[in-house]
């Protein structure tokens, strides 16, 4: 005699097991939901933030920053969208001001290419300077890090001219062309190291030389590291201003041309913001302004008295805008050093900065003021430069 497959007791047991599964699943979901990070909830769009008083409202002039592919203008503590994100995989990034501050050159990055555009201060597109998109993905091109000469007549940028034998070796070189185009008149300045990323972030100097960041393969560590380089003219071999061990990049020259700010990592996972005296050809031993932060994109104030940069709050999180006072150039400069030198040449790093809504009390003469966190709930693009004009 066969027994029935389903009995009341067996059905009740299965129902109880199902209830336990559902309850445990919901419980785990709620537990992890209560303990998950709130970073995504904290980030707000700059235009949604009410104008602030405090240090950010006292920044002189106008700043341009990028968040989420949208270009924002910051004036007196108020953020205004200038170029809204095109949407999809496209984004605006890396603004560079005209010398008179009445317009910009910006990068539009798309899925497989990027181009340079001229826009006015209200965000109206005036001219597309490059046309790098191709029907064939392998022949797309990239243009990044635009920077205009002091008189605004020449545009410098990084560009990847494809190797016809090896289209997948995407490596950037420094180029220049007339500010209004056409690209057919572009001139190649540097020869990058293959398979490294190349030469980026050119800064034209009044002397006609160009400072840039070069990525190279370090045989000692078997890693790709960066150095600050200087080249006197197009096609000339560049000369290193920093050692490869220091892994320095993102150079920014002060308005007076006598100081250079940079981001250095020493090949580690954290960075320091450093400043060095610059005579147009060489750097003096640097001084650490901010240490143990993931600092990025240092940018000088129009009067050279301070530097803004991007860094997350603490060891992780979204990138906020910070400001730190910059020491004035000394009246008597030490002998120049051909490279940034060993770590012993640096000033003693300050403690890791503590976020603050207002500046800390005036420190002793042997210490510099702590950096001030100007924003707290935004999420700026750390790979995009900052533009600042009086």
Language-model regions, residue ranges each:
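Sequence signature of WD/YWTD-type beta-propeller architectures
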Residues: 3-390
């Amino acid at each position: 005699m066969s027994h029935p497959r389903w009995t009341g007791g067996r059905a009740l047991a299965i129902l109880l097991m199902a209830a336990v599964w559902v309850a445990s699943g919901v419980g785990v979901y709620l537990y992890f939901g209560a303990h998950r990070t709130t970073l995504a909830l904290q980030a707000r769009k700059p235009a949604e933030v009410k104008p602030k008083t405090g240090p950010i409202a006292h920044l002189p002039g106008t700043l341009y920053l990028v968040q989420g592919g949208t270009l924002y203008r910051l004036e007196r503590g108020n953020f205004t969208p200038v170029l809204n994100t095109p949407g999809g995989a496209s984004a605006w990034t890396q603004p560079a001001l005209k010398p008179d501050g009445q317009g910009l050159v910006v990068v539009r990055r798309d899925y497989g290419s990027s181009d340079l555009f001229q826009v006015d201060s209200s965000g109206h597109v005036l001219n597309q300077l490059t046309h790098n998109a191709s029907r064939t993905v392998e022949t797309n091109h990239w243009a990044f890090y635009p920077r205009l000469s002091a008189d605004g007549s020449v545009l410098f940028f990084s560009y990847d001219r494809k190797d016809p034998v090896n289209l997948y070796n995407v490596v950037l070189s420094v180029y220049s062309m007339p500010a209004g185009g056409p690209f057919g008149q572009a001139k190649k300045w540097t020869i990058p190291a293959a398979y490294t990323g190349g030469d980026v972030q050119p800064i034209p100097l009044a002397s006609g030389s160009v400072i840039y960041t070069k990525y190279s393969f370090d045989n000692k560590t078997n890693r790709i590291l960066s150095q600050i380089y200087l080249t006197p003219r197009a096609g000339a071999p560049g000369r290193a201003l920093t050692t490869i061990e220091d892994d320095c990049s993102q150079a920014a020259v002060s308005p007076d041309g006598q100081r250079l700010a940079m981001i250095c990592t020493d090949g580690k996972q954290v960075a320091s913001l450093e400043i060095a005296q610059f005579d147009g050809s060489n750097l003096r031993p640097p001084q650490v302004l901010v240490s143990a932060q993931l600092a990025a994109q240092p940018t000088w104030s129009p009067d050279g008295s301070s530097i803004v940069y991007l860094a997350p709050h603490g060891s992780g999180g979204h990138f906020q805008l910070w400001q730190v006072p910059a020491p004035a150039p000394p009246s008597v400069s030490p002998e120049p050093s051909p490279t940034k030198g060993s770590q012993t040449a640096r000033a003693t790093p300050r403690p890791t900065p503590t976020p603050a809504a207002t500046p800390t009390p005036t420190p002793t003469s042997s210490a510099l003021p702590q950096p001030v966190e100007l924003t707290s709930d935004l999420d700026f693009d750390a790979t995009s430069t900052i533009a600042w004009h009086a």
